[in-house]
Amino acid sequence: MKILRIEDLFDLSHTAAGNYLSRFSYGYEALDGLADFIRAYGKTLGEDYTEISPEVYVAKDAHIAPSAVIEAPTVIGHRTEVRPGAFIRGSALIGDDAVVGNSTEIKNAVLFDGAQIPHYNYVGDSILGYKAHMGAGAVASNFRADHGNVTVRTDEETLETGRRKLGTMLGDRAEIGCHAVLCPGSIVGRDSIVYPLVRVRGVIAGKKIVKDHDTVADRK
């Protein structure tokens, strides 16, 4: 199969970064300039946002736990919930109606509207689509054990990203089970499901069910 592009994964109407992402073919290409985009976007926000610290903009109807740590640059959208102990390390664009859960860490990432990483998750150098959801303890690993650049592979093509750190691209409404591990450079298509404890490498097409590393079925 082909490597999934931004247009295959995401409805760009569900993120403030839609116009920005539309400039690129693959999700990873948007990560280098993400911090600069967030800084510029933050300056355009109106009175329904508060700059709670330099370059950290939070919608007034978002709920931020007192123990959450939020570093710049970050934008957090309307009605979004950031729970106790969450660590947002900056370069994070978090949409409306999203959830960043307890003891969850996120950096250099886009969460589309309605995306949820609610319990003990790690999401680095990644993009999570509209209403994508990661179960408790699921992680988007972004660094190879051999410290090499991350490559995206399918049986048809190989994409050299040139990035030392690259997490995952989760398509709209993708569901990731508890304690699943998404290996660096993994891509999960729209409406696909990954079962708990599964390790995902490479590219999973849309509307699939990943039952284990070797068993992928159509989602009916």
What annotation goes with each model-predicted range?
Residues A17-N19, L111-D113, P118-K220:
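Glycine-rich hexapeptide-repeat left-handed beta-helix
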Residues M1-E55, K60, D191, L197, ...:
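Terminal amphipathic alpha-helical/low-complexity segments used for targeting or macromolecular assembly
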Residues V58-S103:
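Glycine-rich active-site/cofactor-binding loop and its immediate structural neighborhood
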Residues A92, T104-I106, A115-I117:
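Periodic small-residue-enriched repeat registers in elongated scaffold domains
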Residues S53, A59, E71, G129, ...:
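Residue-level recognition of the GNAT/N-acetyltransferase active site
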Residues P54-V56, T74, S186, G202:
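Residue "hotspots" at secondary-structure boundaries inside conserved domains
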